[in-house]
From Swiss-Prot:
Transmembrane segments: 5-25, 68-88, 97-117, 136-156, 179-199, 201-221
Main location class: mitochondrion
Keyword Transport listed: yes
One GO molecular-function entry: proton channel activity
Subunit field text: Component of the ATP synthase complex composed at least of ATP5F1A/subunit alpha, ATP5F1B/subunit beta, ATP5MC1/subunit c (homooctomer), MT-ATP6/subunit a, MT-ATP8/subunit 8, ATP5ME/subunit e, ATP5MF/subunit f, ATP5MG/subunit g, ATP5MK/subunit k, ATP5MJ/subunit j, ATP5F1C/subunit gamma, ATP5F1D/subunit delta, ATP5F1E/subunit epsilon, ATP5PF/subunit F6, ATP5PB/subunit b, ATP5PD/subunit d, ATP5PO/subunit OSCP.
GO biological process, one term: proton motive force-driven ATP synthesis
Keyword field: ATP synthesis, CF(0), Hydrogen ion transport, Ion transport, Membrane, Mitochondrion, Mitochondrion inner membrane, Transmembrane, Transmembrane helix, Transport
Database matches in NCBIfam families: ATP_synt_6_or_A
InterPro entries: ATP_synth_F0_asu, ATP_synth_F0_asu_AS, ATP_synth_F0_asu_bact/mt, F0_ATP_A_sf
Compartment(s) where it occurs, according to its Swiss-Prot or TrEMBL record: Mitochondrion inner membrane
Protein name: ATP synthase F(0) complex subunit a
Organism of this sequence: Balaenoptera musculus (Blue whale)
Length: 226
């Protein structure tokens, strides 16, 4: 059994150079641009998925917020495809890296906050102080609300990292256990393999759900600031 449980989460290196960039670019190949007048099945599915995502995420937004629709849809498709590709055996999942998720979360969060302060400065500042707050609690509540505001991108990144990492780690443990049990107890190995198969199906759903949750929270931050 592999003693290093976190070996699958190490960034792959080729000739001493990390190949993370190539892995991140890879999902874009799954969504080709249409180059024909008549769409094929792949393009039709892509357009249907784009319309469905847009309807779910952008229906509550104002016209200013809907200008973010293309970026939010691209974000969802990127995270979802990255998570799904990470389900392939012996593959690397970039979304298990906290640095990458923080790198996605902070610019998006900062963009929504900057949009709010530019378009609705008074309302954005009012979020830092709930209405009807007693005078002696004002300094404390302003500090608390400010801290909670800056924690949002960190929580966004940690949530995605933790859920994807936990799922892959559990699959790795059960898979290693199944291989060990095959030589000692075939019946128990079949049971653990069945559990692994069910967990794999669940992780495919988690991969899509976490992509949707990440994008939805960014959409909610945008809605609060537009």
């Amino acid at each position: 059994m592999n003693e290093n449980l976190f070996a699958p989460f190490m960034i792959p290196v080729m000739l001493g150079i990390p190949i993370t960039t190539l892995i991140i670019i890879l999902p874009s190949i799954l969504f080709p641009a249409p180059n024909r007048l008549i769409n094929n099945r792949t393009i039709s599915i892509q357009q249907w998925l784009t319309k469905l995502t847009s309807k779910q995420l952008m229906s509550v937004h104002s016209p200013k917020g809907q200008t973010w629709s293309l970026m939010l849809i691209s974000l969802f498709l990127f995270i979802a495809s990255t998570n799904l590709l990470g389900m392939l055996p012996h593959s690397f999942t970039p979304t298990t890296q906290l640095s990458m998720n923080v790198g996605m979360a902070i610019p998006l969060w900062a963009g929504t906050v900057a949009t709010g302060f530019r378009n609705k400065t008074k309302m954005s500042l009012a979020h830092l102080l709930p209405q009807g707050t007693p005078t002696f609690l004002i300094p404390m509540l302003v500090i608390i609300e400010t801290i909670s505001l800056f924690i949002q991108p960190v929580a966004l990144a940690v949530r995605l990292t933790a859920n994807i990492t936990a799922g892959h780690l559990l699959m790795h443990l059960i898979g290693e256990t199944t291989l060990v049990l095959m030589s000692t107890s075939l019946f128990t190995a079949i049971i653990t393999f069945t559990i692994l198969a069910l967990l794999t199906i669940l992780e495919f759903r988690v991969a899509l759900i976490q992509a949707y949750v990440f994008t939805l929270l960014v959409s909610l931050y945008l809605h609060d600031n537009t």
